[in-house]
C-alpha cells in the first residue's frame, strides 16, 4: 500500500512513465519490505518464521517459472516441488501452475525484483551511511519504474 501511495503522488516526466509501471519493482518492493520488517523484529519470531516460509515460496516460484518455460517442467514436477519443497497447499500450487502457464516470468518478478531492490540497498549503503528511512523514501520517490531506472536515478 505504501509503495502504491507514493507511486500515485509521483509526477511522471513523460506520458510513458505515467502509464506504465514496473511489476518487477512493485512485487520486489513488497518482498523486500516484508523481509525488512521481519529483520527488524516486527511481530516476533512467529512473523520471522512466516516471512522465511514466504521467501522460500518466492524462490521456488521463480525456479518453476523458469523451468516451465525453458526446461519443459511438467505439471506433476512443478506441483511436487511447490508442495514438497515449498510447503504450499495443493490449491495454491495448482493456481501457481496455471499462472505460470499463462504468463511467462510473472512468478519470477517477486524474487528477481526483491534481489534488485536489495542490490539498490547495497549500492546505496556503499555511498552513504546506513539509514533505511532516508534510503527507502528516496527509492519510493521515483514512482514505480524498473529497479534499473531507480538505481540510475539515485546515481548508483
Residue ranges and their predicted role:
Residues 1-156:
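N-terminal maturation segment of proteins
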